[in-house]
């Protein structure tokens, strides 16, 4: 019996169901401040706070994020143009749509090249350090596969180290140097054995389950190994470093080192200015430079990309260096000091009289100027308008009210059945009322006495 296959399947289910590291970190920070949350879909769309006081996040895009800023960042051509116009260092490049234009673009830009889709993200479709037209043709086809628009960028390959600068609320909060997945030879082990050894690091796991991701040997990896003159069964010479992925993303097995405290002030100022140029409250700026402690203009480095919805993982848990709580400034912006996103909640339970009590309290709240949502055994009401009929005294009905952005006061009938079946739709309330406890429902769910 292959137990490991079942364990791996469970890992995959967990990765599919749980919040990603970036979303999860923001939710954890919210919870630490007493801010309630509701997951709105099976992915990364989350509501923080209740009713009229709610904010939303989807990974690291928030309800405060500029839509036009996201559109600009997702279009590398627009991003590069705006940065170029603002005298920000960017690589020389060209935009093409057809393969027949590739040779001319290569001659214009000059080798070595980077080829990538104009609308790509997370490193998809990117090929770097291209040194011939033959390589460029393969890279062009790869970029096309990852592009929705079919528009491809051909730009100069800038040498140096890959840095990610994270700017939140127009302030640099973290910086990391990223290294692509790689192995270093010892003169004895095959490349596959070296990969297995790297993957045995307890910090590496499947997907986002740990701070690092295991290195997989896909077709791209095999191509890079072949281009270096090896196969997976080759013994790598001692101290030789073999790159296994085109990009330095942690999700493909890369590593990250925190360098926040050594970024040159000119580069800090540039990153913060870029966030305003692109108009993003949260952005990840990718820079290639030989030395982040010097201004970009002194090293010949360049800004490669500006990313909306950047990943936080490399900053929350870098491979080396100081972890940064980059979720904190996100919550600072969404919920200024003293705000917790809550609305008043009155919850009513008991054997008899719950609905009458709920209606009475909702009426009193409405007469005092509140926009009331309430649940009863005959339906859900928002400002006395019936929106859902039937017995609506369970947790899903409570969530219905707490999700409504027009509600600033909730009165929730919470019947015994829903409590036993699925609990409450909220983790705490301001006022809890038990009308009475009678013998009406004895004998159900293992309850046989009033004392029970």
What are these regions (language model features)?
Residues 56-218, 265:
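Active-site nucleotide/adenylate-binding loops and adjacent lid/helix of ATP-dependent enzymes
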Residues 37, 90, 113, 152, ...:
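Hydrophobic anchor at the start of a short beta-strand
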Residues 1-32, 171-193, 245-349:
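ATP-dependent carboxylate activation and anion-phosphoryl transfer catalytic cores
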Residues 194-255:
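Extended, charge-rich helix/loop segments that form flexible
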Residues 110, 149, 280, 406-407:
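Short, high-confidence coil segments that cap the C-terminus of an alpha-helix
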